[in-house]
């Protein structure tokens, strides 16, 4: 599987693992559902599809989107979780080392909220990536207004 299918709608990715504390993983799943982020795992829990499905059902009671995609961990040089990534569509162009060009994405790691990650990326990233982060923050602000139908 390639990064291509993420290009159009997945500019916000949260890299996670079932080794993370359950309360943190549940909270990130809740935030991912609210913000439209996709949660990405490196592989199966206990090398079992059934165990992975069961763990995802327990952790993801809000219905956030999940995927198992080890290549994305490499593409975005993710070595710890949680890591938050904002990526431009051209992040799919992979270099010889299997990584996306540094100018096409920005990441931040740590036990922080998705909003804090987006705001930090907005302030620190290159202009194109900062613009994506700002647009995502604006959608979140609009969606959180009372009576909003923005998703």
Language-model region placement:
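Thioredoxin-like thiol-disulfide oxidoreductase module
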Residues: 56-81
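A short, hydrophobic beta-strand/beta-hairpin element that forms part of a small beta-sheet core
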Residues: 82-96
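Residues in flexible loops and secondary-structure boundaries
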Residues: 74-76, 84-86, 116
């Amino acid at each position: 599987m390639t990064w291509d299918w993420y290009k159009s709608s997945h500019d916000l990715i949260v890299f996670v693992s079932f080794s993370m504390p359950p309360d943190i993983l549940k909270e990130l799943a809740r935030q991912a559902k609210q913000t439209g982020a996709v949660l990405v795992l490196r592989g199966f829990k206990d090398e079992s599809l059934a165990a992975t499905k069961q763990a995802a059902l327990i952790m993801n009671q809000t219905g956030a989107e999940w995927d198992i995609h080890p290549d994305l961990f490499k593409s975005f040089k993710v070595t710890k979780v949680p890591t938050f990534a904002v990526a431009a569509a051209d992040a799919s162009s992979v270099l010889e080392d299997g990584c996306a060009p540094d100018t096409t994405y920005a990441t931040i790691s740590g036990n922080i909220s998705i909003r804090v990650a987006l705001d930090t990326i907005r302030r620190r990233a290159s202009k194109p990536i900062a613009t994506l982060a700002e647009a995502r923050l604006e959608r979140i602000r609009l969606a959180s207004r009372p009576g909003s139908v923005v998703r």
